[in-house]
Structures are given as C-alpha cells and as structure tokens.
C-alpha cells in the first residue's frame, strides 16, 4: 500500500494547489470587468485630445513645437516600458520582452544608445539583466492609476528629450484587444507624428478661436497628451494582466483537475493491486493449512 499512499499524498497536494489557482482565477475575474471599464473610459479622451492637437498644429504651423520636430541625428533612444509587478499571467511579459528586445537590437545595430524608464518589477528585472541603463522605475503602481501617480517616473525621460540628450522615445506595453488577446505594442511617443496630425486636420474642417494663442495651448495640451498616453498605456496593460492571469489560472485549475483524475485512476489501480495481492496471500495460506 506504500505506492497507494504516495499517490494519495500527490492527490492531496494537487487539490491544494487547485484551490489556490481557483481562488486566484476568481479574484482576477472579479477585477477584469472593473479594470476594463477604467481602460475603455480613457479611449474617447485620447481620441478627442488628438483631434484638438491636430488643429493646433495647423494653427501654429509657423513655429513647430519641439515635441513635433524630427531630430537631424539620432544618438540615444528611450523606451518607456510597461510591465507587471507580479507573474502568473501566462506569456504576457515574455511576449512583451521578446518584442521589446527585437526592437532594441534593431536600434543598437544602428549605433544608437538605449535608456529606459520602467513600470513594474518584471520589466526592471529584465532590463537589468540586459544591462540597459534605467533613468527611473516605478513599482507597485495601482490598478486604477491616476496621472499624478505616474508622471514622476516619466519626467526624467521627457527632460532628456527637451535637453536634446534623447532623440526618440518609444512607449512599450500590451494593448487590450479582448479577453483572449493581448498584443505587445511599441509606439513612438516623441517626436509626435506630424503626418498623423495632418491626417486628422484634413478629415475635420472646423477650427477654434485660440486664447491667448495656439502655441501656448499646444504646449499645454502636448504635455497633457504625453501624460495621458502613459496613463492609458498603463491602464491597457493592467487590463491585459488581469485577463491573462484569469486565463492562466483557469488553465492551471483545469490541468490540476485532469491530473487529479489521472492520479485517482492510478490510486484505484494501485489499491486494487494491493487488495488482490492480499487476497492471494490469504488464499495461499489457507491452502497450505
């Protein structure tokens, strides 16, 4: 019966693990809807502020804002990387880091230096291993982040761009498509695309009256746009994290259930074998008498 006891111990251990993964699945599921609503709530604001900036670019075309000017020469590229603080979310971080590293290698082949600002412990650990210089990091950020909780981390990167020390800035994170699909995405944050603004301007013919002037309003709005873009990217990544964790824990719970059935079958066979052996020994003893 020693083999049966070992199997029974394994079953008990797997059931204990299954309870944990089931609980984590339920916790993630309870958060998914809330963080998705928070994430989706910011998308209309992002669309409208892009339209306003597009018209402001047209109105102040005589003096192009520094955030819109393409550099003559690129020496240093910055990445704002948004990862998770915790694991157990499937391949979410792994896929993101693969995409990021391919992009970094492409920039390094061009002779560009790399610096980064990182959200989340997983990203910090990855870029430290890759020996990428980190300008700033933020860990344990909230599930429904507010702008003032995030802007401190991105200021060193933005200031580096303003001083001309960084010529390009990319924002890297997962974009939520649906509960089953999270897409790692790299988007150029600075310099902002003038072509994008022209396209938006051509589509909408209305205009504003600017007070005091279009340039000062554009400066303020571009700063708000950068802050909100980072906030929205963090919100998207959190929604991806919760969905990925829910699916990962559901898969783990299902696998645990299948393993329990398999172990239970082995246990029954081992117990049957032990009982058959005992009966055989009893019958053999009776025959001997």
Curated annotation (Swiss-Prot):
One of the Pfam families matching this protein, by short name: ATP-synt
Subunit organization: F-type ATPases have 2 components, CF(1) - the catalytic core - and CF(0) - the membrane proton channel. CF(1) has five subunits: alpha(3), beta(3), gamma(1), delta(1), epsilon(1). CF(0) has three main subunits: a, b and c.
Family matches, as NCBIfam families: ATPsyn_F1gamma, PRK05621.1-1
Function text: Produces ATP from ADP in the presence of a proton gradient across the membrane. The gamma chain is believed to be important in regulating ATPase activity and the flow of protons through the CF(0) complex.
Record carries keyword Transport: yes
Keywords assigned: ATP synthesis, Cell inner membrane, Cell membrane, CF(1), Hydrogen ion transport, Ion transport, Membrane, Transport
UniProt-recorded name of the protein: ATP synthase gamma chain
PANTHER family cross-referenced by the UniProt entry: ATP SYNTHASE GAMMA CHAIN, ATP SYNTHASE SUBUNIT GAMMA, MITOCHONDRIAL
A GO CC term attached to the entry: proton-transporting ATP synthase complex
Record gene name: atpG
Family: Belongs to the ATPase gamma chain family.
HAMAP family referenced in this protein's UniProt entry, alphabetically: ATP_synth_gamma_bact
Localization per record: Cell inner membrane
Membrane topology, record value: Peripheral membrane protein
GO BP field: proton motive force-driven plasma membrane ATP synthesis
GO molecular function list: ATP binding; proton-transporting ATP synthase activity, rotational mechanism
Location (main, coarse): membrane
Lineage: Bacteria, Pseudomonadati, Pseudomonadota, Gammaproteobacteria, Cardiobacteriales
SUPFAM superfamilies, sorted: ATP synthase (F1-ATPase), gamma subunit (SSF52943)
